[in-house]
Swiss-Prot record:
It comes from the Bacteria. GO terms for molecular function: DNA binding; DNA-directed RNA polymerase activity; ribonucleoside binding. PANTHER family: DNA-DIRECTED RNA POLYMERASE I SUBUNIT 2 (PTHR20856). The RNAP catalytic core consists of 2 alpha, 1 beta, 1 beta' and 1 omega subunit. When a sigma factor is associated with the core the holoenzyme is formed, which can initiate transcription. The lineage of its organism: Bacteria, Bacillati, Bacillota, Bacilli, Lactobacillales. HAMAP family: RNApol_bact_RpoB. Belongs to the RNA polymerase beta chain family. It holds the Pfam family RNA_pol_Rpb2_6. It comes from Lactobacillus helveticus (strain DPC 4571). InterPro entries: DNA-dir_RNA_pol_bsu_ext_1_sf (IPR042107), DNA-dir_RNA_pol_bsu_external_1 (IPR019462), DNA-dir_RNA_pol_su2 (IPR015712), DNA-dir_RNAP_su2_dom (IPR007120), DNA-dir_RNAP_su2_hyb_sf (IPR037033), RNA_pol_bsu_bac (IPR010243), RNA_pol_bsu_CS (IPR007121), RNA_pol_bsu_protrusion (IPR007644). This is DNA-directed RNA polymerase subunit beta. It catalyses: RNA(n) + a ribonucleoside 5'-triphosphate = RNA(n+1) + diphosphate. GO terms for cellular component: DNA-directed RNA polymerase complex.
Length: 1213
């Protein structure tokens, strides 16, 4: 009897699962992070922004413009059309506005066009200018009030406070070494804290002491805060002091000072806490939070009946708090109202809630705890009560009452998703528009003006365009494979506007925090400078309305102490209050705990407790990790560094022609593929009526017919072939949301990133030294690891000053054989096989007309001859771009296609390359066990098993022990057993097969109990000395292929100023011979080799042309001249006003001629290469060179010097 139980993944794949935990909760939809947020933006976000900014009134108050509602019209293009036409998938937005004339009472309502709003596709991406983009969610500090505690050099604790808004000025409190408290308003110089208290309208020292109670730090601060100007009251002086800090050097009056302070903190238009900021402040300052664990210094009674709730000297425990909580929420319990001075920033009474407790430092001393009262959630600005309560908390910290905050705690960091980021951008545009509307209101005639005339939509359109086009968070979607797409949509970045920067982020921010548990994946993060700043959402996590990440837990009943199936989603803040058991904790059938002592989590500690202490239990072990990490079998047996690489490398797997699902999976593959957006999903249940490679038709139960079109070989963002193949047969019954067609890297509706080759862990002739991989030729012959890359090339025919460019077959000086694959219009035919340098689109551009002589003008007038020439600017296949022409698209103005200004025709040619696995390609398993292919060995030479089967891949066993990714060995053995038994298995992370399960399955498959076998050498037939581990592992081919990296240059472009070769494959550059390489040649004394490297091969402009000429003619190479870099140095020194001359050995000045002065030495290499054939025309070539090249050289100084077969305008991608 086999271990585990059978589970169906979709209709087409069955796996034997080793999971021992019942799944209480289904995975949420994995792209909801994006789609739900955008839906919120459309439903509520847009309205919120309009409500914030409208109504807009003019300065006199005669006119007022109000928002009534908005609607989106039908998008101009569908998703596929937008992709094809390089357009944006967007819907026109019309806003209904109401203009009221307050004097006449006349109302005008009008629908105003507000630009196109980009729409989200069903899978959570946007199409902008034809490219698929993702808006990455941002992880930022939540608005709220934060307290920090630090120790100075004397060991005394110093506290600081920051009040952070969503937008607006910061407020900071701090103590110094002398125990004086200060405030900084909006990052300015500090003032005594009591100045801010006085500005709230609490003027005298005695009032301040009454309000906050006597303490050392308060007394020191009052001593520091002296009354300077007796003409002003203390309140007026305080307000002026703050004004002086904010606007130094400006004349200050009480009124202007008051209005400035009001505008900075208390004006809802300028200061916004957002609902989350208000929620955090209310939570932090409320007495519910602050009383817990304190000793009461007064008796608390019911205000209605006088019944005692808690006596003096009671310690507030959970039980006491349960009784107190309802009273603390009441508006008549322990409320105190202070009447501020009329000169304060706000004259309204300030109501707070106050309760006295004993100090933790001096138990005899009473400390007053003050909360901000009950402020409604829609009050998004600060109130004086907030300021006073936050100061009270700050003073209480000195008495060890209250807690400091950890900024890296996920209760203090929140997620800004697409909807919110887009809303902020929309708000910026609308605020800019508001200014224009106000101005226009005062200029135009109030009787005739309409809403349309007041609105200028340019700022709104511009700010949305800018966001999608150039924001750091709007990213080109990763489309190597569906897992990459899905992960990109679930990514959380701490970078971007309003976030951190790479250089300023320290270790603390990047580190794994205990609150990441079940919220952010501790494994999946990039390896480079962004490590820890870019994270991935955990698989079961959701984001609440405030932007905090919540994770699900099973509730444990308080009465029975049994685990229920009731699920609660907890934020990191809430989770801190509970003790939580792990998902692997053994349970009885009735839900009670088997053991008397349970290992559980409490905040950052692991504790052992009895079952009655447990509040919650994890839902499932894989809730800790992200989707990509959850796809790694035996993750629990891998070292975390290698697991990180494994998670990241799966996203780089190349889509293969015929992928196979992994024999050893985790059960996550089906959902990952289903939710990625690459699979074709049934919209409704029904029966399949027709299937072919391009279309599937399904008849619903109510008789309607659904038609689904499959994607065929579409080029993805990363030049991969995205191709869909049917997953259903004629007559199949389909349920809603079934996978009816596999996308790329999918098999039977599951993610299938690679293949399942037979792998042996053994060395072979040193071919797998240092992570190199040795492959069998079978993998090449049978196209096991063959993928398709599709690249697109564009050619545009524009209007130039000298006339329009023309796409044509008539090209100057081009032989017929070069045109054999072009059609009558000069465009390559679909299906043609093209190689480097072949013409794809024939195009000619008018050349400059030379001055005509009188006779030529006469001839031109008589015969109408075209006197001006054209030059060939055809689109050619770039280096390494050869392949089969897969598709050609032609867009013209006449056909009504939208082209950029000045373009008449655009041709796009798609070239597909079939790439077999070869030496130099990168491969990897799912455990970070990556390597490059070092040898492809004939099948007959490969080591073979006792039954004669040659192995497919040999990996070096030395790659395992030091890296500690043992998961690959367990996968290898289980994979071998699964293939033998003809089954697929699932081993979910942290809850899958253990070692015993693996060996049991190996035994049942009839494999030797050590999992090893004798291996024979394919060349000699001799057995190797030791037994070898052989099995089946899911192995991937990664996107880093040698074809994309290999590069060589003989002749190519040079940099304009230095005249040295460019660098890099994209620029067709040379290899840099650097400082240290020069030392090496110097050490060898290779003087002539070094000289030619520093002159002809680099920047001796004249010398290299002459050298080329000499090589072509077979003559001796002349001596080199002066390198251009020397001339650049001289010119730089001359530009500093130094008189630099170059002298020879006899102290005679050497003339450094400018490049375009003597152009006979700047012959184009094109003409030189022809010289070899036509040396007799040498004189003529020089003559024409002298006259014509002067003009040409000025124009072409920045052109690459290239032989005849180099194209002038390089294909720029």
């Amino acid at each position: 009897m086999l271990n585990g139980h059978v589970v169906n993944y979709g209709k087409h794949r069955t796996r034997r699962s080793f999971s021992r935990i019942k799944e209480v909760l289904k995975l949420p939809n994995l792209t909801d992070v994006q789609t739900e947020s955008y839906k919120w933006f459309l439903d509520k976000g847009i309205k919120e922004v309009f409500d914030d900014i409208m109504p807009i009134s003019d300065f006199s108050g005669k006119l007022s413009l109000e928002y009534e509602g908005y609607k989106l019209q039908k998008p101009k293009y569908t998703v596929d059309e937008a992709r094809d036409h390089d357009a944006t998938y967007a819907a026109p937005m019309r806003v209904t506005l109401k203009l009221t004339n307050q004097e006449t009472g006349e109302i005008k309502t009008q629908d105003v066009f507000f630009g196109d709003l980009p729409l989200m596709t069903e899978s959570g991406s946007f199409i902008v200018n034809g490219a698929e983009r993702v808006i990455v969610s941002q992880l930022v500090r939540s608005p709220g009030v934060y307290y920090t505690g630090d120790y100075d050099k004397n060991g005394r604790q110093i506290f600081g406070t920051t009040v952070i808004p969503n937008r607006g000025a910061w407020l900071e409190y701090e103590t110094d070494a002398k125990n004086v408290s200060f405030v900084r308003v909006d990052r300015t110089r500090k003032l005594p804290l009591t100045v801010l208290i006085r500005a709230m309208g609490i003027g005298s020292d005695s009032d301040i002491i009454d309000m906050f109670g006597q303490s050392d730090t308060l007394q020191f601060t009052l001593d520091k805060d002296v009354h300077k100007n007796p003409a002003d009251s203390r309140v007026a002086e305080a307000i002026k002091d703050i004004y002086e800090r904010l606007r130094p050097g400006e004349p200050k009056t009480t009124d202007s000072s008051r209005s400035l302070l009001y505008a900075r903190f208390f004006d809802p238009r300028r200061y916004d806490l957002a609902p989350v900021g208000r929620y955090k402040i209310n939570k932090k300052l409320s007495l519910k939070n602050r009383l817990y664990g304190q000793t009461l210094a007064e008796t608390l009674a019911d205000p209605d009946t006088g019944e005692i709730i808690a006596k003096k000297d009671t310690v507030v425990t959970h039980e006491v708090m349960d009784k107190l909580a309802p009273y603390l929420d009441r508006d008549d319990f322990k409320m105190v109202t202070y009447q501020p001075s009329k000169e304060g920033v706000l004259p309204d009474p300030i109501t707070v809630q106050e309760i006295k407790v004993y100090s933790k430092v001096d138990p005899e001393r009473e400390v007053k705890l003050m909360s901000n009262g009950h402020i409604a959630e829609d009050v998004k600005h600060l109130t004086p009560a907030d300021v006073l309560a936050s100061i009270n908390y700050f003073f209480a910290l000195q008495d060890k009452i209250g807690t400091t905050d950890d900024i890296d705690h996920l209760g203090n960091r929140r997620i800004r998703r697409v909807g919110e980021l887009l809303q902020n951008q929309f708000r910026i545009g609308l605020a800019r528009m508001e200014r224009v509307v106000r101005e226009r209101m005062s200029i135009q005639d109030p009787l005739t003006v309409t809403p349309q005339q007041l609105i200028n939509i340019r700022p709104i359109v511009a700010s949305i365009k800018e966001f999608f086009g150039s924001s750091q968070l709007s990213q080109f979607m990763d489309q190597h494979n569906p897992l990459g797409e899905l992960t990109h949509k679930r990514r959380m970045s701490a970078l971007g506007p309003g976030g951190l920067t790479r250089d300023r982020a320290g270790y603390e921010v990047r580190d794994v925090h205990y609150t990441h548990y079940g919220r952010l994946c501790p494994i999946e993060t990039p390896e480079g400078p962004n490590i820890g700043l870019i994270n991935s959402l955990a698989s079961y996590a959701i984001i609440n309305k405030y932007g905090f990440i919540e994770t699900p837990y099973r509730r444990v009943s308080w009465k029975t102490h049994k685990v229920t199936d009731k699920i609660d989603y907890l934020t990191a803040d809430e989770e801190d209050n509970y003790i939580i058991a792990g998902a692997n904790t053994p349970l009885n059938d009735d839900g009670s705990f088997k053991s008397d002592v349970i290992l559980a989590r409490q905040k950052e500690d692991n504790v052992e407790v009895t079952p009655d202490k447990i509040d919650y239990m994890d839902v499932i072990p894989k809730q800790v990790v992200s989707v990509a990490s959850a796809c790694i079998p035996f993750l629990e047996n891998d070292d975390s560094n290698r697991a990180l690489m494994g998670a990241n490398q799966q996203r780089q797997a190349e889509p293969l022609i015929n992928p196979h699902g992994s024999l050893v999976g985790t059960g996550m593959e089906y959902r990952a593929a289903h939710d990625s957006g690459a699979a074709l999903i049934a919209k409704a249940a029904g029966t399949v009526e027709y299937v072919d490679a391009n279309e599937i038709r399904i008849r619903r139960e109510d008789g309607t017919l659904d038609k689904y079109t499959l994607e065929k070989y579409r080029r993805s963002n990363n030049s991969k072939s995205y191709n869909q193949t049917p997953n259903v047969k004629l007559g199949d019954h389909v349920d809603v949301s079934d996978v009816i067609a596999n996308g790329p890297t999918m098999d039977h509706g599951e993610l299938a990133l690679g293949q399942n080759p037979l792998i042996a862990f053994m060395t072979w002739n040193m071919y797998n030294y240092e992570d190199a991989i040795m492959l069998s030729e079978r993998l090449v012959k049978d196209d096991v690891y063959t993928s398709i890359s599709i690249e697109d090339y564009e050619s545009e025919a524009r209007d130039t000053k000298l006339g329009p460019e023309e796409i044509t077959r008539e090209l100057p000086n081009i032989g017929e054989d070069a045109l054999k694959d072009l059609d009558a219009d000069g465009i390559v035919r679909v299906g043609a096989e093209v190689h480097d340098g072949d013409i794809l689109v024939g195009k000619v551009t008018p050349k400059g007309v030379t001055e005509l002589s009188a006779e030529e003008r006469l001839l031109h007038a008589i015969f109408g001859e075209k006197a001006h020439e054209v030059r060939d600017t055809s689109l050619r296949v770039p280096h390494g771009g050869g392949g089969i022409v897969q598709d050609v698209k032609v867009y013209t103005r006449e056909a009504g296609d939208e082209l950029s200004p000045g373009v008449n025709t655009m041709v796009r040619v798609y070239i597909a390359q079939k790439r077999k696995i070869q030496v130099g390609d990168k491969m990897s398993g799912r455990h970070g066990n990556k390597g490059t292919v070092a040898a492809v060995v004939p099948e007959e030479d490969m080591p073979y098993l006792p039954d004669g089967t040659p192995v497919d891949i040999c990996l070096n066993p030395m790659g395992v022990p030091s890296r500690m990714n043992i998961g690959q060995l367990l996968e290898l053995h289980l994979g071998a057993a699964a293939r033998q038994l003809g089954i697929h298995v699932a081993t979910p992370v942290f809850a899958g097969a253990n070692e015993n399960d693996v060996w049991d399955t190996v035994r049942q498959a009839g494999i030797d109990k050590d999992g090893k076998t004798v291996i024979y050498d394919g060349r000699t037939g001799e057995p190797f000395h030791n037994r070898v581990s052989v099995g089946v592992m899911h192995y991937l081919k990664l996107t880093h292929m040698v074809d994309d990296k290999i590069h060589a240059r003989s002749i190519g472009p040079y940099s304009l100023v230095t005249q040295q070769p460019l660098g890099g494959k994209a620029q067709f550059g040379g290899q840099r011979f650097g400082e240290m390489e020069v030392w090496a040649l110097e050490a060898y004394g290779a003087a002539y080799t070094l000289q030619e490297i520093l002159t002809y091969k680099s920047d001796d402009v004249v010398g290299r042309v002459k050298a080329y000429e000499a090589i072509v003619k077979g003559e001796r190479i002349p001596k080199p001249g002066v390198p251009e870099s020397f001339r650049v140095l001289v010119k730089e020194l001359q530009s500093l006003g130094l008189d630099i001359r170059v002298l020879d050995m006899n102290h005679n000045e050497i003339e450094l001629r400018d490049m375009d002065e003597d152009s006979s030495e700047h012959l184009n290499i094109d003409s030189l290469s022809r010289m070899a054939e036509e040396q007799e025309k040498k004189k003529l070539a020089e003559e024409t060179g002298k006259s014509g090249d002067k003009k040409e050289n000025k124009k072409d100084a920045d052109k690459p010097v290239a032989p005849a077969d180099e194209s002038d305008d390089k294909v720029s991608k």
